[in-house]
Structure formats: C-alpha cells, structure tokens
A protein has these predicted regions:
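Gram-negative/organellar outer-membrane beta-barrel architecture
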Residues: 1-158, 165-166
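C-terminal outer-membrane beta-barrel translocator/porin domains of Gram-negative envelope proteins
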Residues: 1-3, 10, 129-231
Length: 231
C-alpha cells in the first residue's frame, strides 16, 4: 500500500492547430507513511517516486504530414535491496527531440517516428547492488536514437473494437553516440481486435524483443540499464 499524488495540465489543441502541450507532476511513497522499515533484519528505506515532465508536439507542421515534438523531464525512483523491481535509488534528467512522418506506402495507416534522447542517471544503493545492476557505476550518461515504425488501423485509439496495431521499435544507445549506456534493443508488438457478440471484443497480441550490449566508443565500461532489460 502507499500514497501517490500529482497533477497535470494538457492542452490538446494548443495554438488552435492540433498542437499538444503537456505538463505533469507526480510524487508518491509506498508501504505506509514511515520513512523506513525492517525487512529480514535489514533497515530499508521505503521507495519514493517523483516525476516531472513537460512536452510539446505538433502533429502536422505547416499542414504537412510531418510531426515535430520535444520534451524534458526529471524522474526519481526510490528503492532498496529488498525491492527487486527497483533495487537502486535512481534519478534521471532527460531531454528528447522527435520527428515523425505519415507514409504514403504501403498505405496511409503506416507512420514512422525518429527520436534523439539525452539523459543523465545517478544511482545510490549498496555496493553489492551497484556492482550487480550498473557495473559499480554511480553516474552514467546516455544518448539514444530510437526508430519506431507502426501501422494502426484501429477504429478507436482507447477502446478499439476492430482493426489492428503493429509496431517495430529499434533503439541504439551509446556506441558511436558516446556514453556508458551502450546497447541495441528491438521490440516487435502485434495486436488485433475481433468483434465476437454483443459488445464483447477479442484481443490477440504477440510481443517479442531482444537486447544486446554494445562496446563503448572509448573502450570504457558499458552496461544495459536494468529498466531497459527484459525480466
């Protein structure tokens, strides 16, 4: 159990041309209101979380099929050795720039986006957890290039009853781009929706992915962040 609070502002038609401006802030603490508790004889801090983000997206720049977007944010995820899902306290400051395009071929349902993201992460925790999850590092820089190709023919984006959604996401982090987070990651996701009877819809899905570590450009130590691994 825990307590989470926050708020946000969303302007879906900012400046009257379909542009989207968003701001959000969330903060929470898990497992009660005290600052720490005892787990198997070990005093463990309760995980705290804080997230702030600001983003802007223009889906049709100058009435063309091009998309432009940018975002900045700060993310803090608390943890301890007893919290397997977040073993380290991690703080991340990031910024990203995105360009997208609606394709004419094979059909109008296809589109692609390309994003450059820069981030700096700081880790704190026991030395054993630092060695296990981040190779003993306490601070890392990451530069990523992300390509997403997708086809979306769903009749409704939130509660679809017919159609399909396909996406192929490719991430290249570090390597020739620099930084300590050096890996490639590929994820393919398929979803399709079939009406059955009355208002019931059958959703079928298939997801597969692979992640592989890459060498650092300067020969220094590198690793795959545990948030980007498959567990």
């Amino acid at each position: 159990y825990g307590l989470t609070g926050g708020g946000g502002l969303s302007l879906p038609n900012f400046r009257g041309k379909g542009q989207s401006f968003t701001f959000s802030y969330n903060e929470g603490i898990s497992s009660g209101s005290q600052n720490s508790y005892v787990y198997q004889g070990i005093n463990v801090d309760r995980p705290k979380n804080r997230r702030i983000s600001i983003g802007f997206t223009d889906p049709m720049v100058n009435d063309t099929k091009n998309l432009l977007g940018a975002s900045i944010g700060y993310d803090m995820r608390g943890g301890g050795s007893a919290m397997y899902y977040s073993p380290l306290e991690t703080t991340t400051a990031y910024g990203s720039f995105m360009w997208g395009r609606i394709f004419k071929w094979p059909d109008d349902f296809f589109r692609g986006t390309w994003r450059i993201m820069m981030r700096r992460r700081s880790y704190s925790g026991s030395q054993a957890d630092l060695e296990k999850y981040v190779g003993g590092l306490t601070k890392t820089d990451g530069i990523s290039f992300v390509q997403t190709i997708k086809r979306d023919s769903r009749d409704h984006p939130e509660f679809p009853t017919l159609g399909s959604h396909f996406s192929l996401n490719t991430t290249l982090s570090g390597w020739i781009l620099g930084g300590q987070e050096n890996f490639q990651k590929h994820v393919m996701n398929l979803e399709w929706y079939t009406p059955t009877f009355w208002k019931f819809v059958l959703m079928s899905s298939f997801k597969i992915g692979i992640a592989k570590e890459l060498p650092a450009r300067d020969g220094s130590s590198s690793y795959i962040p545990f948030y980007d691994r498959f567990i």
